[in-house]
């Protein structure tokens, strides 16, 4: 859907203000839209530091994690960006939290991210007390998508 299109991401704070009439409680991750020439220039100059994602992509496919990429991979991605800048966004590489995770070798720390859920009714909007925590099961990986070998954990809020 439209909300899954990564090119919408920079506009989410404005959408919150428009639809909910309030300021966002959390800030967005800085996002450069490669379709904008000045932003593309910034991305090309900082490729080894950034995560670059296809705007229409899903599941962790078609992305570059600059700090983990080889020089060859970075140069290949540079050419892709120049050929189709409108198809990509870029973000800084985030330092994800870790949590103890049961893996083949035992319990070990793995990177995680949280997907909260919001329920909307005609008279109110409600944040679900919990969410889905996505886990990068490969040691050192920042890619939490299940299609790329990631896993999931239920997350519950036990006290407010």
Task: Place the predicted regions along the sequence by residue.
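Domain-scale recognition of functional cores that engage charged ligands
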Residues: 1-160
